[in-house]
Amino acid sequence: MSVLVPMVVEQTSRGERAYDIYSRLLKDRIIFLGSAIDDHVANLVIAQMLFLEAEDPDKDIHLYINSPGGSISAGMAIFDTMQYIRPDVSTICVGLAASMGAFLLAAGAKGKRFALPNSEIMIHQPMGGTQGQAVDIEIHAKRILAIRDNLNRILSEITGKPLEQIARDTDRDHFMTAREAREYGLIDEVITKRELPAK
């Protein structure tokens, strides 16, 4: 199935310039994560972050999230890049931030993590499946438990919640409204209107 990407036409001193909508948003330092997170999506998001850092290392990047989650390794690559680059990454949930999407939402710069009022945020423990010989299954089980412990530790640091509470809350799908996510410490503010930039 092919996806249609809207085009935006702008007038410049050299005439008209057409951009796909994502390139136009990038000019305003906006990255839109609007799908499941896999290696391809992670590489695109990371490349955009690195580009924006090179453009201006002191200006915030705005990461809009509407994602059901996805690959842990791909999501952690985005997470690590968010911590690595110099600009603050402001996160904004529009719609759904679930699983790794919620993790990335919470990983935004403190004071700059937002959700629109009807957003839904969901945290849970990592899921995985494997097959093969018993020893291989044991190796994978140990790995996913280590990943779970690492994700819980990071969420505990981000939210200020005790590790034991994070472990309980992520044991099953834990859905939250935007306001509940704010109380939990995953975001800083529920926003309804974008503030106009100062003139």
UniProtKB/Swiss-Prot annotation:
Biological role stated in the UniProt entry: Cleaves peptides in various proteins in a process that requires ATP hydrolysis. Has a chymotrypsin-like activity. Plays a major role in the degradation of misfolded proteins.
Main localization (coarse): cytoplasm
InterPro entries cross-referenced by the UniProt entry: ClpP, ClpP/crotonase-like_dom_sf, ClpP/TepA, ClpP_His_AS, ClpP_Ser_AS
Subcellular location, record wording: Cytoplasm
Gene3D superfamilies: 2-enoyl-CoA Hydratase, Chain A, domain 1 (3.90.226.10)
NCBIfam families tied to this protein: clpP, PRK00277.1, PRK12553.1
Protein name: ATP-dependent Clp protease proteolytic subunit
UniProt similarity note: Belongs to the peptidase S14 family.
UniProt cross-references to SUPFAM superfamilies, sorted A to Z: ClpP/crotonase (SSF52096)
GO-annotated cellular components: cytoplasm; endopeptidase Clp complex
Keyword Cytoplasm: yes
Lineage: Bacteria, Bacillati, Bacillota, Clostridia, Moorellales
Protein species of origin: Moorella thermoacetica (strain ATCC 39073 / JCM 9320)
Taxonomy, superkingdom: Bacteria
Single GO MF descriptor: ATP-dependent peptidase activity
Keyword tags: Cytoplasm, Hydrolase, Protease, Serine protease
